[in-house]
């Protein structure tokens, strides 16, 4: 296929799609140019069904530093592992695409997005999401799209689609919404305490804008789209299924209704193992034993899936016996750990998170050097999910995509209520350790983070709580669940996380397993989430009503002084020599910004006070009219040089030593002698003239003798 180009305008910027020129051996490939951002997307599919009980979809978002005209950092000067932003963007694209593949599809699919040029005012992630959907849609991969996504901002009561950098900085909302022509299927948002009504309207505005992008994709697919390949879907033997359901459905139904998680898992596992043992023995000699046992496992999964959903939708019974809108038992604790700067332990049923606060000088902020201009990140929220939290063994190592994503969600939820840098000049790190998990651990980490911040004396604007909402839908009827647990998440259709204060929402995240959800479901879920959020905030505020007025004794104290900008180099010294000497002497940490604000950090107040004295001395300037107790440091024929303070000397001219005539300076003064002087002049070069005689009363003039007249 020769190169074909398709052009439109979206949100005030040109959107150009090129097909047929590059990456032609992929199943589908596009080059998307949005503004001056250019993204190459290639989609490929394996020829055979993969083994395993899940759909092996991999979405990558690769940031090439040349796209922004930069050299990669590090010794190797080559792109390494994806940045956090790249990982989050890959997840952002994966989530709306994944539900658009058929149930039982098991061929491996890879969607690789490479940013070739970067324009900070034209969203490369949104171009990559568009390109991912289009590459799949024009390929022979059986993708039931297209989908598209947009960013939505909110400024002065107006919604803005795909805001530029300046607009986003002024926006009260940073929302990414994706979906198909029919419905929304992915949401990711941070917001400055906006109401449910505003958030819902933003979602609908975003979905409305998506229609334009989907129509553009459909236009392109009609011209260059390939016929979809026939692939084998994972389907179980219907006779085998009927046999197992008839024999064991009642036993599995009973096991599913055991309320306690571990007991329920043991009961369901016992039924499954009994079934597997029977059929493994029955078909031991069959050459298709592996396929049969795969089908047995899949049938049992489907039976459990169906029973959980039936109980909720028909009987209105949840696996643990709760009502549809009931939250699990809550518990909140502060000061769980000694010595640290703040800690909070939050428990919701069998989900438990410990959050630990660390405060540090601003010099500890994280420097982010990606495609965007380098910036410093003051607040970090890290989320760890060890396998012991679910009673299992597993991989330990660097944080995976899920942990990075959950940490980022908590970060967005909490950063909206943090004090400004002027109010609280600290770098802030929260680490959430998930100690138990039975669903909604990311929301537990937000609640624990609120406890740790308030316990640590961080003056947040308001406490934040999070809740996860679920959905069971049969296409006609649906049930919205409050505070979903693991089983409801696994077998449900939606995981909709809502975090916020009593004033409004600070973060949203939604993932679904069906094609999309309606505005009515969104509205109902937001309303139930608000009620639940207030219940959780009641528990948090009963534990600690407001941030403590003081920091923990172990936290670094801070004092700030202001110096003239032209004195910054004096405090730092050549090659940092002066500031390093101060730090070595006092043991403090010092940050100096470009405006001359000097922040001094230490757990020892005496060390802070001593540092302030040293810096004040370094930046001190002589002033005309002020008197100084000085020391003679050099004598010349024309006068004496005296040291006023630190590195500031002044000249006392020979005529300014005394009111009487001084013939020889050394007859009056000697090096090392202490004298009081008054500054009488500072010239344009900063040279200081001082006087000793100005401090001595001027002797009266001798009376003139009267002349005698004869």
From Swiss-Prot:
Cofactor requirements of the protein: Mg(2+)
Entry binding sites for Mg(2+): 489, 495
Domain S1 motif: residue ranges: 625-693
Subcellular location per the Swiss-Prot or TrEMBL entry: Cytoplasm
A cellular component term, taken from the record's GO annotations: cytosol
Catalytic activity from the UniProt record: RNA(n+1) + phosphate = RNA(n) + a ribonucleoside 5'-diphosphate
Pfam families (alphabetical): KH_1 (PF00013), PNPase (PF03726), RNase_PH (PF01138), RNase_PH_C (PF03725), S1 (PF00575)
Record EC number: 2.7.7.8
Domain KH: 556-615
Coarse class of the protein's main subcellular location: cytoplasm
Keywords of the record: Cytoplasm, Magnesium, Metal-binding, Nucleotidyltransferase, RNA-binding, Transferase
InterPro entries: ExoRNase_PH_dom1, ExoRNase_PH_dom2, ExoRNase_PH_dom2_sf, KH_dom, KH_dom_type_1, KH_dom_type_1_sf, NA-bd_OB-fold, PNPase
Segments for region (Disordered): 691-710
Molecular function via GO: 3'-5'-RNA exonuclease activity; magnesium ion binding; polyribonucleotide nucleotidyltransferase activity; RNA binding
The keyword Nucleotidyltransferase belongs to this UniProt entry's keyword annotation: yes
Keyword Repressor applies: no
UniProt biased composition (Basic and acidic residues): 700-710
An example Gene Ontology biological process: mRNA catabolic process
Free-text function comment from the UniProt entry: Involved in mRNA degradation. Catalyzes the phosphorolysis of single-stranded polyribonucleotides processively in the 3'- to 5'-direction.
PANTHER family found in the cross-reference section: POLYRIBONUCLEOTIDE NUCLEOTIDYLTRANSFERASE, POLYRIBONUCLEOTIDE NUCLEOTIDYLTRANSFERASE 1, MITOCHONDRIAL
Family membership: Belongs to the polyribonucleotide nucleotidyltransferase family.
Name under which the protein is recorded: Polyribonucleotide nucleotidyltransferase
Organism, scientific name: Streptococcus pyogenes serotype M1
Gene (name only): pnp
């Amino acid at each position: 296929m020769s190169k074909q180009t398709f052009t439109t305008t979206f949100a005030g910027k040109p959107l150009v799609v090129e097909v047929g020129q590059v990456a032609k051996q992929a199943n589908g490939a596009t080059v998307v140019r949005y503004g001056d951002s250019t993204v190459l997307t290639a989609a490929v599919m394996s020829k055979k069904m993969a083994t395993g009980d899940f759909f092996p979809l991999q979405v990558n978002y690769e940031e090439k530093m040349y796209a922004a005209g930069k050299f990669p950092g590090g010794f190797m000067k080559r792109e390494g592992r994806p940045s956090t932003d790249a990982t989050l963007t890959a997840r952002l694209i994966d989530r709306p695409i994944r539900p658009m593949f058929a149930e039982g599809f098991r061929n491996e699919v890879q969607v690789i997005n490479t940013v070739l040029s970067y324009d900070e005012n034209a969203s490369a992630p949104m171009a990559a999401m568009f390109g991912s959907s289009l590459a799949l849609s024009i390929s022979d991969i059986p993708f039931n799209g297209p989908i598209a996504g947009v960013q939505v901002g909110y400024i002065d009561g107006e919604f803005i689609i795909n805001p530029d950098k300046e607009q986003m900085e002024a926006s009260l909302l940073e929302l990414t919404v994706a979906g198909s022509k029919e419905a929304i299927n992915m949401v990711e948002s941070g917001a400055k305490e906006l109401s449910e009504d505003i958030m819902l309207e933003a979602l609908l505005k975003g979905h409305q804008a998506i229609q334009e992008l989907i129509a553009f994709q459909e236009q392109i697919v009609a011209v260059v789209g390939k016929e979809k390949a026939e692939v084998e879907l994972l389907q179980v033997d219907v006779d085998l299924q009927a046999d197992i359901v008839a024999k064991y459905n009642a036993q599995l139904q009973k096991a599913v209704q055991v309320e306690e998680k571990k007991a329920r898992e043991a009961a369901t596992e016992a039924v499954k193992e009994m079934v597997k043992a029977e059929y493994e023995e029955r078909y031991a000699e069959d050459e298709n034993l592996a396929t049969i046992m795969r089908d047995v496992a899949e049938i049992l999964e489907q039976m459990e899936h169906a029973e959980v959903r039936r109980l909720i939708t028909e009987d209105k019974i949840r696996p643990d016996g709760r009502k549809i809108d009931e939250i699990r038992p809550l518990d909140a604790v502060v000061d769980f750990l000694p010595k640290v700067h703040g800690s909070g332990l939050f428990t919701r049923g069998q989900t438990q998170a410990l959050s630990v606060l660390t405060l540090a000088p601003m010099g500890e902020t994280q420097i982010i050097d990606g495609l965007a201009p380098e910036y410093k990140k003051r607040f970090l929220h890290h989320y760890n999910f060890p396998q012991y939290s679910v009673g299992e063994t597993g991989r330990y190592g660097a944080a995976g995509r899920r942990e990075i994503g959950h940490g980022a969600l908590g970060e967005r939820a909490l950063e909206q209520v943090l004090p400004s840098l002027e109010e609280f000049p600290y770098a802030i790190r929260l680490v959430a350790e998930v100690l138990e998990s039975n669903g909604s651990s990311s929301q537990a980490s937000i609640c624990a983070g609120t406890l740790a911040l308030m316990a640590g004396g961080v003056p947040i604007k308001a406490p934040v709580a999070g809740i996860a909402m679920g959905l069971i839908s049969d296409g006609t009827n649906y049930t919205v669940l409050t505070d979903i647990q693991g089983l409801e998440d696994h077998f449900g259709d939606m995981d909709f996380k809502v975090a916020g204060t009593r004033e409004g929402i600070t973060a949203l995240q939604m993932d679904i397993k069906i094609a999309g959800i309606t505005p009515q479901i969104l509205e109902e879920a937001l309303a139930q989430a608000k009620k639940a959020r207030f219940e959780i905030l009641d528990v948090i505020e009963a534990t600690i009503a407001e941030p403590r007025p003081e920091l923990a004794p172990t936290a670094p104290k801070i004092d700030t002084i202001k110096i003239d900008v032209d004195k910054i180099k004096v405090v730092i010294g050549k090659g940092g020599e002066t500031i390093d000497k101060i730090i070595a002497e006092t043991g403090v940490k010092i940050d100096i910004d470009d405006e001359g604000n000097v922040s001094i950090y230490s757990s020892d107040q005496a060390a802070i006070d001593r540092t302030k004295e040293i810096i004040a001395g370094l930046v001190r300037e002589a002033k005309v009219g002020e008197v100084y107790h000085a020391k003679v440091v050099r004598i010349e024929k024309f006068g004496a040089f005296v040291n006023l303070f630190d590195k500031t000397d002044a000249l006392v001219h020979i005529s300014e030593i005394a009111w009487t005539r001084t013939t020889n300076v050394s007859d009056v003064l000697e090096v090392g002698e202490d004298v009081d002087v008054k500054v009488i002049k500072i010239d344009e070069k900063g040279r200081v003239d001082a006087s000793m005689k100005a401090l001595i009363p001027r002797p009266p003039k001798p009376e003139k003798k009267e002349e005698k007249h004869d």
